[in-house]
């Protein structure tokens, strides 16, 4: 099954690339690696704001991470023209806007990791990962994620 067939079976339509909010580009490709800039959580077209542990639950954070993963695939599609060219997701880095006592950043980030495995399969979707708790994310978003993918 192609990546697009899988997305369609999940009822997912890839979004267009969002305009950068500052002085950066959405992606850079060097050789067979594509580096995607951080994408923030959005809900109903607006920034999904808040802090984990202070009004945003772990489950909501996980949903936000999944939403970001969908946005990341929209950008990756724009970068390479065909998601079936993805050989693997290499690395995911997640910044979780959280209070100092919140310790479930890894569970929040599973929202993206599990989505990539679902779409690309257990081998291509498996990746190295970091999940950080931070005091703030741009525009007050609850989660920001960046991605590195290998294409061929």
Predicted features along the sequence, with ranges:
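Short, polar/acidic, helix-capping and beta-turn segments at strand->helix junctions
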Residues: 1-152
């Amino acid at each position: 099954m192609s990546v697009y067939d899988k997305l369609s079976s999940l009822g997912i339509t890839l979004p267009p690339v969002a305009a950068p909010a500052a002085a950066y580009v959405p992606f850079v490709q060097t050789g067979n690696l594509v580096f995607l800039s951080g994408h923030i959580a959005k809900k109903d077209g607006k920034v999904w704001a808040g802090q984990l542990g202070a009004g945003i639950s772990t489950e909501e954070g996980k949903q936000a991470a999944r939403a970001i993963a969908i946005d990341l695939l929209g950008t990756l599609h724009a970068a390479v023209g065909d998601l079936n060219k993805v050989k693997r997701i290499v690395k995911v880095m997640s910044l979780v806007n959280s209070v100092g006592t919140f310790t479930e950043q890894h569970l929040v980030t599973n929202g993206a990791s599990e989505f990539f495995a679902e779409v690309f399969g257990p081998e291509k979707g498996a990746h190295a990962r970091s999940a950080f708790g931070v005091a703030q994310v741009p525009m007050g978003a609850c989660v920001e994620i960046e991605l590195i993918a290998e294409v061929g």
